[in-house]
Amino acid sequence: MKQLLCVLLLAGVLRAAEPVFPYGAVYFRKSNPPEEDWARDHATAARMGMNMFRHWFMWASIEVAPGKYDWRDYDRMMDLAAKNGIKVVIAEMVTAAPEWVFDKYPHARFHASDDSVVHSSIGGSSATGGFPGVCLDNEDVRALAERFLTALAARYRNHPATYGYDLWNENSYGGGSPQKMHCYCQATQRKFRDWLKGRYTTMDALASSWGRHSYPDWSYVHPPRNFGGYSESLDWLEFRIDDAFRLLHWRSELFRRVDPKNHIVAHGVAGTLDALPSSANDEWRSAAEVETWGFTWVASRKGSELWKQFHAVDLVRAGSRGKPFWHAEAQAGPLWMQPQVIGRPREDGRISDDKDVRLWNLISCAGGATGILYPRWRPLLDGPLFGAFGPYGMDGSVTPRSEMAAKVARWANSHTEIWKSRPVHGDIGIVFVPESELFAYVQQGATAQYAESARGAYQAFFDSNIQADWVHVDDIAQYKAVYLPYPLMLKAATAAKLSKYVENGGILISEGLPAYFSDHGKAGATQPRLGLDRLFGAKESYVEFTPDLLENLTLEVRGSKIGGRFFLQEYETAGGTAAGHFANGHIAAVENKVGNGRTLLIGSYPGASYFRHHQPEAKKFFAGLLEWAGITQLTTSNDAQVQARLHTGAGGTWLWVVNPTREPRMVTVGVGAEYRKATDVWQERSHRVDGRRVEVKVDDRNVAVIRLE
C-alpha cells in the first residue's frame, strides 16, 4: 500500500490542495454503489468538477470480529479518491455497531421508556446491519468504539485523500418520542443520577423539586417514564441533551488527539427549533465542537417554499457563530413514496430537475454556505430510499441534474473572491431560548407551538425582505433589536439576561406570557415576575389558556390589526404605556422605557398566527417594527416573491437576488449604499445601477450573484 500511495500522491498533486469550495456527495456506504463501477464513478466525478466525497466508515461493516478489521473496500475508496484528486471526509459511524457487540454486551442495547430493547437492524440508508448502534453510556462498549475510531484515524490520517472527519451523522439522538424514548439502560440511569447530584447537591433538594419524598438514597432515583410540565421531565430532557453533547465532545477530542492535522466537521438537520427535546438538535452546541458545521436539507421532506430553506440556512449560520458551514446534504434527485411527500404536487420538491438543483444550491450560498454535498452521488439500489436524492442516474450515468451540479461546482471553485465575503448582520434578531422549546414539549408532548411561533415571526419579516437572524439568548447583545417568540417558560437567568440587554440599550419585542412558567416548570402566582413586570411596565389582569378557542384571535397593536394564537394575556400598565387592545377594549400590548432601552410586550403569539394565516396587515406590522426600533432595512425588494441578500468582506460586496418562481422577474433592489457598477457573475450579465437601487433581471428558478462596485 505504501508504494501505491507514493504513486497516487504524485498523480493527485495538482488537485490535492484543499478545494476553494467543497463540492461533492456521499459516495460509499458499503452496500452501494456496485464495486464494478467504483473506478468509473470516481473518474466521472473528477471530470465533472467534484472535489469531495464523504464515505460512511461503519463500525459494523469494518470490525468484523473483535479486533479484526476489514479495510479493503475503504482503502480502495481512499486510493481512488487520491488518484482522481478528490478529497475525502471520513464519516465515523459508530451508530452502526458490530453484530457481535449486540450479543456480547446485551446490557448496552438501547432500553426504551416502554421497557422494550432495541436490536440490530438494517439501516434505511445502507443495506447493512448494526443500526442504531448501542448505548455509549456503557463504558465497556464506549472503549470498544474508541478502539475502532482510533484505528480508523491512525490508518488514514496520512493518506493524501484525507480531508477530515465527519462526526455523529446528522447530530441527532434517536429514540426521542415520549412513548418510546432512549435510553433507560442502567449505565444511562447512573449518569443521570450523577448529573442530578451536580444540579441539586442534596437528596432533599431533589426530592423537593421533583415532589418525590420517599427516596432512601440516590440509587432509587430513576428517569421519568411519562412527561408532564414537571421538574423531573425538564431535568431528564436537559440531561439527555448534555449527555449527547458529552459524547460529541468525546468524538472530537479523540480525533484531534489521534490526528491533529486534518479537519473536524459535522452536520445536523437544522432541527433546533423543533427537535431539541427529542433529538438533541442544537446548532450552537454542535458547531462549537467542530471547525466546520453543516446541515441536511431536502425540499422533498420539508417543502420548497423559499422561506423554509432560507430559515434553515440562517439557523445553521447563526449556530456556527462565524465558522464556515456547508449544505452537507442537499437534494438533487427525487424521493419516492416516503410519508413526507404523499399528497404534495410533484413540483414541490418531489421530482427534481436541473433548475431545482441550481436554485437550491444557490439559496444556500446566498445564506452563507461555502460548500455543498449531496446525500448520494448516485441513488441507492435498495431499501426505502432507493432512487432518492442523487444527481446522477441509477447506473451512475450523467443526467441534466448532474450537469447542473457540475456547472455550479466549477463556477464556485473559479470565484475564490465570493467566499471571502460573508452575509451581513441581519436587521433584527429572533431569540432562541432553549427552555421555551423544552417546556412546550413536556407540557404538550410536542414542540409545534414553539416552532410555529418562531418560524411564523421569521416568515413575517422574510415576506418583507427583512433579514431576521436567529440569535441565541447568550448573543443578543450583538443586535440593536430582538424579537422573543413564545416565551412561556423562561429561567430566572434568562430573564436577567433580557433585562440586562434592555438596560444597556437593547430593544426587546416580546410575545405574551413571558416567564409564566420558570425554573422547574412552576407558574408564578403573579405575572409577569422575575423583574419582568418592571422591564415591560405591565402587570397581568387576565389570562386565557384556550388554544382551541383562540385560533382566530385578533388584537390591535400600534394601529395594526394582527392575529394571536394559543393563549392571551391582558394587562394593566405599571409604568409602561398601552400600545394595543383586544376587541373587548382591554390592554393587549404595552410599551416601556427601561434604562437605555425599550420594550414592547404583546399579549399573545402573533408569530404563530402569521405562520397559519399570513395576514397582510400583520406583515406590515412586523415590517413596521424596524421603523419603531429606529432601524433602516438593509435590502429591499419591490417584488415580494424575490429575496435579496447582501454579503460584504475581503472579497468585496455581493448582492444575491433569488427568484424561486417559474418565470423571469424584473426587480428593483434597494441597498444601503451607492454603487456605480453591478456585474452578475452567475448569469453573466450587467445590471443597471441607480445610486442605492439596482435593477435586476433574474431568470426563472435562478439567482443573480452580483458584484457591487
Regions found by a protein language model. Give the residues of each.
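Aromatic-lined substrate-binding rim segments of carbohydrate-active enzymes
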Residues: 39-46, 51-120, 149-153, 251-259, ...
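Short, acidic/polar
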Residues: 32-47, 145-151, 275-286, 353-361
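The substrate-binding groove and active-site-proximal loops of carbohydrate-active enzymes
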Residues: 23-34, 56-72, 126-146, 181, ...
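Carbohydrate-binding surfaces of carbohydrate-active enzymes
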Residues: 301-311, 315-709
